Amino acid sequence: MIFLFLLPFYLGVSSYMMFRFFYWMKHCNHRFNWLRFKVPFAVVYLFMALSPVIAFLLPKSAVAIVIRRISTYWIGIMLYSLLYVVLFDLLRLIAKHTKLKNTLLFSRGSVISIGSVVVACAVATCLYGIFNARNIKVNEYSVTVNKSCGSDKHLKAVLVADLHMGYAIGVDHITNMVEKINQQDADIVIIAGDIFDNSYDGMDDPEGIKAQLKSIKSKYGVYAVYGNHDIDEKILMGFTFDWGGKQLHNEKMTNFMKECNIKLINDESVLINDEFYLVGRRDTDKPGTEDGTRAEISELTKDLDKTKPIFVLSHEPDELQKTADAGADIDFSGHTHDGQLFPGNLTIGLFWENPCGIIKKDNMYSIVTSGVGVYGTFMRVGTDAEICSVDIDFAG
């Protein structure tokens, strides 16, 4: 319900941005100050600004899906437009209290020039963010586990997470991801949650996506856990609304995963080829259980043969010390998106011990991916969409 408190602020910011645009346009040409321009522009602008709310209120339909997709771009456009406008307004405010206040900096020509720079910067940033979000990179890691893995001296695991299949991420993006995965010649593929984007019905082509996911190639198969967005909930600009109901996993989602030949391991462990364990954990915030809890990692590993490699798959990179103490050799996670958008990429490290990349916790490696998809807005600025190819050597 936080968004209900932020809604007046959002509407205020949206109004401020509209009037700043009008201010710039009337300096560019007096005709832009005519009602015949301002009224149509205001109607279109207000539709865009309210598109997240409109999509939220509409019942599920093709129209609602289109409007929600529009809103995924609008959120980013608003963010960076606001960032640049506020930046230049602050600079002008500072200049107003210096010797520059009586210079050409405050002339009509300056208003036109500065406004043009703001628009150009916002457009360039958003276009870069959109294209960068579509470009899935391969990030490679190499680790050594001091255990024996049967006849395997080497294992290649491909980690993906945060697909967020739905209104923003469709079959084209998933096709790109699968192509990247299959190029790695993986022994095992693991998906660390947020496979869906809070809605099964938001997918543009479920059968097409299913065909792509079924085509993933690996020696030991594909395993996954659910994340906090693998719950069917109403979502508005990143804020979810459960209306007090139980946050259980959607049966459609689970059946879809089975049909894709993806094995869900929520709070369970599997011994693969009698050589290594893969332990899957439910999500911390939204485990999808009747009582809203998940099993402790120590409970999941207590009966395992600790002489064999133990890999943990958890959506959020939390409880790293507990996971290391429980005997895990590698903890695979996602969730953070590495901040996804500047300046979030600069502050994400304040909230997570390992926001993205690889660290070592005692004898355990923590590997966190920035994810394949996006959340909120279809942009990535300062971060990359990625899959992680992890080469594991065994020295036992």
Language-model segments: which ranges?
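Soluble catalytic domains of enzymes that build or remodel membrane lipids, polysaccharides, and related
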Residues: 147-396
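Non-catalytic terminal accessory segments
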Residues: 1-134
